[in-house]
Amino acid sequence: MDSAVSTIMTGVENLRIALQDVPGFRTVASAPYMFRPFIMLVFLGIAAGLVGVIVNLRCMEFNAEAMVHSVFPGIVAGALYWGIDNIVPGAAIVAVIVAIALTWLGRSRRINEAGTAIVLISFFGFGIVLSLYKGDMSGQLEALMFGRLLEVSDTRLVQSILVCLIALIAIGVSWRAQISRASARDGAMAAGMNATAVDFLANAAIAAVVVASSSAVGILLVVGYLVV
């Protein structure tokens, strides 16, 4: 993993040096601590832009809101037990569980919203309790919620880029199915579409964007990327 991070960051540093004298890039390319957040925001913007289209077309705003809050315990656990550079893996583990839960709840229109609300409240509440139970989190809790963009490390940048690519793959391979599901839900199911798989890919893509942004933008602000 370390060698892969080193290789990718060497390429990022070479790109930064190449852009130093290019008008419009001089500020962000002036130092590595400025260029890392810039690269992260570029990848996050591309992934969130495409995933956000599906979120709005399929009226999955509440799912996105639930995912944003529900990954919080994974972020807290990753930071407390494995170190700040393991925020993304910790959030990813919880995000997979939440994506499965939201997909299962989405199969029933009757319990969908109520069940989603329960998932949101339960996971987010557990994250708050965990963060307060483990000691003095003054300042740290706010950082986990709203992010610290200029403190992005090489490891977290690479992790976030990889997760953004997962989001793009998940939404890319199911793009046609997602559009069909959005425009004619019942017709798509009558045509033999695997609705559960399509829904899971949509939730997984949302989860990936949330996880990718967790270490920099913060879990609460990413909903603006997906919905607004």
Residue ranges and their predicted role:
Residues 53-137:
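Short loop segments and helix-boundary regions at transmembrane helix junctions
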Residues 21-27, 109, 116-174, 201-204:
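Transmembrane helix-bundle core of multi-pass membrane transporters
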Residues 33-45, 84-96, 161-165, 211-225:
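Structural signature of hydrophobic alpha-helical transmembrane segments
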Residues 27-35, 77-86, 134, 154, ...:
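Helix-coil boundary and interhelical linker segments in multi-pass alpha-helical membrane proteins
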Residues 169-202:
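Membrane-helix/interface signature in polytopic inner-membrane proteins
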Residues 41-49, 75, 96-100, 125-128, ...:
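Hydrophobic core segments of alpha-helical transmembrane domains in multi-pass membrane transport
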Residues 46-50, 68-72, 96, 196-208, ...:
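Hydrophobic alpha-helical segments embedded in the membrane of multi-pass proteins
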Residues 1-46:
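Membrane-interfacial amphipathic/re-entrant helices at transmembrane-helix boundaries
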